[in-house]
Every structure is written in C-alpha cells, then in structure tokens.
C-alpha cells in the first residue's frame, strides 16, 4: 500500500499525486486546491478519475471550476483525506508499521480486489 503524508501546500499536480495513495494523512492546516484551470491546464494526470471515486460530482466540479482552496480538515469532509493529523508523517509511519505486521500475501490479494 502507498501512504501519503501531506503538509504545507498541495496544489494541482501535488494533489493529484497524493490522491493516488491508498491512504492519505493530511495536516489540518494543509492548503489544498485543484489549480490546473487557473494555469490554463486540465487535471489530466489521473487525478480527476481518482477524485470521481472520492468526491461528490457537484463538489468536484465546483472545486475544479473555481480553484477554491480548502484546508486539510476540509479535505477529510470532502473525501480527499483518510485521516487528518497535526503530525501526518508520524501517523503515516504508524499506519505503515501496522500494515507491515500483516500477512503480505493477504495484503497483495486485498490490493488486487481494491484495484479492480
């Protein structure tokens, strides 16, 4: 599994990359936004396809069209975050340690089911 720990600014491609993780731990003060349209681009690195499974369609459209910035706390409510934690790296490492103690064959099988 891939775990993302996000703090600071996570705009555009950074948000797309973080969204590809299996588990996303976000600092509550992180600044996040779908910024591509502001720059004359479209979120075409796979982010939009991922977001459609995480975020309500009307909300995703609004975030994409307006480039509205949101916090890490908002990210949880919107569906972008699995957890919100003031120390995302420590939380991500704790989750990784827990996962590492599980059966790797079962982990791979679960990942295959999730990725269908």
Where does each model-flagged region fall?
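Terminal peptide-recognition signature
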Residues: 1, 18, 75, 110
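CoA-thioester-processing core
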Residues: 5, 11-64, 91, 95
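Helix-turn-helix DNA-binding module
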Residues: 13, 76-78
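C-terminal long alpha-helix characteristic of the crotonase
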Residues: 25-30, 81-116
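Conserved active-site and cofactor/substrate-binding residues in soluble primary-metabolism enzymes
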Residues: 46, 70, 105
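Short alpha-helical scaffolding segments that buttress acidic/His motifs in well-ordered protein cores
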Residues: 63-67, 110-113
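Acidic, divalent-metal-coordinating active-site segment for phosphoryl/phosphodiester hydrolysis
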Residues: 67-74
């Amino acid at each position: 599994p891939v775990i993302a720990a996000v703090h600071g600014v996570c705009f555009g491609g950074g948000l797309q990359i973080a969204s590809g993780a299996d588990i996303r731990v976000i600092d509550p003060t992180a600044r996040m936004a779908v910024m591509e349209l502001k720059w004359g681009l479209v979120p075409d690195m796979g982010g939009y396809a991922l977001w459609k499974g995480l975020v309500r369609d009307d909300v995703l459209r609004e975030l994409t069209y307006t480039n509205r910035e949101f916090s890490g706390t908002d990210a949880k409510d919107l569906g972008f975050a699995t957890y919100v934690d003031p120390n995302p790296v420590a939380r991500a490492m704790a989750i990784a340690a827990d996962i590492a103690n599980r059966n790797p064959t079962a982990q791979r099988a679960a990942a295959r089911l999730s990725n269908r």
